[in-house]
């Protein structure tokens, strides 16, 4: 099985929950002795603090320049590259992934407790209309 991981959080110098989770995931998979290949998709050179086995490959996928670079990478460049690599499954570990993901994808969602416990303010008319449009658009999509 060929596994892809959106590992850009691990390649960033800033510490935090996404980086810790992604590095832990990579380290855990690296410790397994199995026949699986792993592709780590990063947006800059990545040198982990632990050795990567031979069946791991780091792939730099950049999104471009400017404010839209992260969105373009996530929505267009990364799904395209993951299909080119012939992955069996792609894991997006940081709360977001492409609208049209690869055929087999896993998305990890973190920190839902505050969302579930916090009372939501009433939606404005514009918000309700946008939700209805968005849901109607998605319900008519064919994949």
Label each residue range with its predicted role.
Residues 1-143:
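Carbohydrate transferase catalytic cores enriched for Leloir-type hexosyltransferases
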């Amino acid at each position: 099985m060929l596994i892809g991981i959106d590992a850009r959080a691990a390649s960033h110098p800033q510490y935090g929950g996404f980086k810790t989770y992604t590095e832990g995931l990579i380290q855990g998979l690296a410790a397994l002795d199995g026949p699986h290949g792993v592709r780590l998709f990063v947006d800059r050179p990545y040198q982990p603090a632990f050795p990567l086995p031979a069946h791991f490959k780091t792939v730099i996928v950049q999104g471009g320049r400017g404010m839209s670079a992260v969105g373009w990478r996530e929505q267009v460049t990364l799904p395209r590259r993951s299909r080119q690599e012939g992955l069996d499954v792609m894991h997006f570990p940081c709360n977001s992934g492409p609208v049209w993901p690869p055929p087999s994808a896993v998305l990890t969602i973190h920190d839902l407790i505050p969302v579930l416990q916090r009372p939501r303010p009433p939606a404005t008319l514009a918000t309700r209309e946008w939700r209805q449009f968005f849901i109607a658009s998605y319900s008519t999509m064919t994949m």
